[in-house]
Structures are given as C-alpha cells and as structure tokens.
Amino acid sequence: MNRSRKVKPLKAIIIVLFVLFVVNETSLFKNDKTHTFDEAFAKQMQGDALHTKSKGNQFVNASKQDIKAAMTVDHKDSDLMYMDLSEPIEMSEDEVNDMLKGNGILEGHGKAFLEAQKENDVNVIYLVSHAQLETGEGRSALAKGLRKGDARYYNFFGIGAFDRKAVKTGASYAQKAGWTSPDKAIKGGASFVRTQYFENGQLNLYQMRWNPQSPATNQYASDIDWPAKIAARMEVYYQKYGIKKDDIRKDFYKK
C-alpha cells in the first residue's frame, strides 16, 4: 500500500486558502501554455537543439519520427516523467544508501544526497536516479574524478558535458564550480537543477527535456529518451519504498 512521504507543513492549510491556491495554480498552468504541440515540434526541428537516441553503445541522431514520438505525452508513460520534482520526500539515510549500493563512487553518500534535497528542494530519488544514469552507476570517468593540478574534480549530473567532448567539458565545468569532492558534486548538481530548471518553471523530467514553454532552449539532455530512462529508475524505488506519486502534470500545450 502506497503512503505519502512528502514533507508536510506543521500546520493544516485553511480550506479557503487551499481553494484559492488551486484556482490560481490552474490559471497559472493555462497561462504558461505558449505553443500548440505542432508549433513546439516545429521549433525543435528548426532550432539548434541536438536530438539523439541510444543505439548499441553509442548515440546517433534521432529521426524526425523518433523525436515526435518522444515528445508526445502518452498515457502509457510513467507518471514519474510528469511529476513535480521540486518537492522533497521523506527518506532515511539507510534507504538512500541502499539505493546507492554497488554504485561505485556514489556508494555510501546517502547523507550528501539527503542534504542536497533539503538545501535545494529537489526530490532525492530523482537526484539518485539522475546521478546513476549520468555516471553509469558511479563508474564513468567524470564520476571517478579527473585530476587537474593538485585537485580532483567530480561531476555526477553531466553538467556542462557536451556530447562530443563530454569528459573534457564536464571536467572543466566541475573545476570552475569547485567540485573537489563527491559531496560537493552532489550538492552542486542539485543546486544547478534548482536554479537553472526549477526556477525556470521546468519542474518535471518532461519539461526539463522538452521545455514546452520555450521549445528548443534550456533543455537538459540531447537524448530524446532521457526522461523515460530516469523515470524508469525512479519507478523501481517508488514501488520498493511504497511512496505515493504526487503532483502529476501532463497538459503543456495549447489546443
């Protein structure tokens, strides 16, 4: 049986304020629909955004049909692709460390992931799942850290790691950010997601990848299946720990 483990306020919300909030939120969602789906798709095709898909052990350019299919909001998709990730959830350090077992350099850093969630209001299961995907379960070159001078720099979220020179550019970003330890890379990555995406209104995986409000700009990944891959990992943990999925949104486009 699923139970809600969202961090809740200490005082109950007055019903009138709650109703006003719902009305305001509904209006906000309506106002942020800037394009029809077809208009957004056209912008993705016309812009400079890179769209790839995995084929074997490499990434190749995605076809127009593949891109449109990945962009399409499907009821068969995991709800976690469309869930608000800006809300912390209650997890113990032991539970987070359990998720990180066998994950190379990520293993044992449950406390840092929980602190990153608390400091930045970023869902900890998302953070773990994203880091696992980007680092190949903590075993990529960027995850192990690249030495420059007397320091070693870590990057667990692929930040600044541009596809063709991912290791070089990702390490350069980590150096500029001062991520000289795994904990700094975890917290720095969470802060980046908060400031660059959540504060831009991109609160779920779909929005982070496709940015419906401003298509072909500020998109986290080039992989068209990036949201589905992270959602699949999150799904395993949500089921394992019996956590309720809250705040799902699937309407992004004008009719």
Locate each region found by the language model.
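Catalytic cores of secreted/periplasmic lytic hydrolases that degrade extracellular macromolecules
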Residues: N2-I125, E137-K255
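Outer-envelope exported proteins of Gram-negative bacteria
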Residues: L127-S129
